[in-house]
Amino acid sequence: MEVILEHLLHRAHELYQEDASSFELHSQLLLPFLDGSFTLEEYLKLDDGVLGTYFTQWSESADPILNDLAKRFLNRKPLKSATFSGNRDSKLVQELTLLVEKVGYNPVYYTAVNSSYDLPYDFYRPEQGRHRTQIEILRNDGTLIELSQVSQLVAALAGQEQGDERFFFPKEMVDPSLRDHYDLFDETYQEFASHIRNGALIEIN
């Protein structure tokens, strides 16, 4: 849902730049965020209830993108995603983005690329520029020992990046039951779906 939320707020920001008055009537607590001038106090005023109220109002907006993204967020309908290799599949991602646009979705708001690589745990390595504070265990004699030295599981994971790269797109691209104009773009949908297998992007030779 994070991608939908990010794109929803992005669309609101764009519309706010065009006509601030439309948001001043019903989204007062979000105004500082839409113009990029919020304070900590204003941030703390936001909660799920406030955002839910505003998003419900946006779901009735005359703007089709704001309207649709708000409904997707409220109804918990996230964009679907598939893993890919950035080095190998960058061209394929561009091609699939064009197919999403071809069937009528604005790719700015209905596609995304996200990398979630991270280190679950790493021990202190002063020779590396990117190191983390290690976890140490206090032993009975008062000495400290680094966590990976007493845990085989942590030792196996230490220093290993976990995560993947994902391409996000509307679920309608691969689920015929969700489409309004399946016949009109049948070949485009089929071409897109042919590049998705087992949750990953694939090249078709």
Give the positions of each predicted feature.
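Histidine-centered, transition-metal-coordinating active-site segments
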Residues: 1-205
